[in-house]
Amino acid sequence: DSLQVSTGPCPACGSSDANALYDDGHTYCHSCKTHVQGTGEPTIRKSRTVRSGVFLNGEVRALNKRGLTEATCQRFGYSVGALRSGVPVQIATYRDAGGSIVAQHTRDADKNFAWVGDSKQATLYGENLCRGSGRRIVVTEGEIDALSVSQAFGNTWDVVSLPGGASGALKACRKSLSFLEGYDEVVLWFDADEAGRTAVETVVDLFTPGRCKIALSTRKDANETLVLDGVKAVT
């Protein structure tokens, strides 16, 4: 199977981030379903490919434009740093089931995403912070959205996000299914676009009937809800 290495804009439908690039060169847009065949050779894109090696150093700070406090970023290990090329990025640090750091997911100002380390070993983002059981857990599409929901609830709720966004929702939820099934309710708060809605439809049947709840919002995602409408709109 090919491995997704990044998401980005789709030239066919204009979606800003639904077009997934895979390591054999093919692309698939989860919004308009456009498939572009690759060459079969490994795809190399500067600042977008999966890279291994020493992890990046970052500084934890408040993300004011996102409405996120330093304390929230510290809790999730979300920092600001730079790629070895010097490109400024935000860095989400991922851990494996044992709690060890195994990968980092980076994002630059142009929404280019890349992995450092071994993303295949990574659990859901924030899974290491969770109790593993309880009344409710919220699953968001992106890391910033997970931080947003967590902060809105005083960083007391269990909140996680998908490592690969909407396109990797089924694989990620299946991998962590036993963990997620430990909760009475699993709330899916994916982006309010076609890719997000499709992702919800693909994963909801994984769970025990009645366990999944779908969060509905008039905004694009949880962070936009927090920034534009405030904490009460999230909670």
Each language-model region and where it sits:
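A generic structural motif
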Residues: 162-164, 212-221
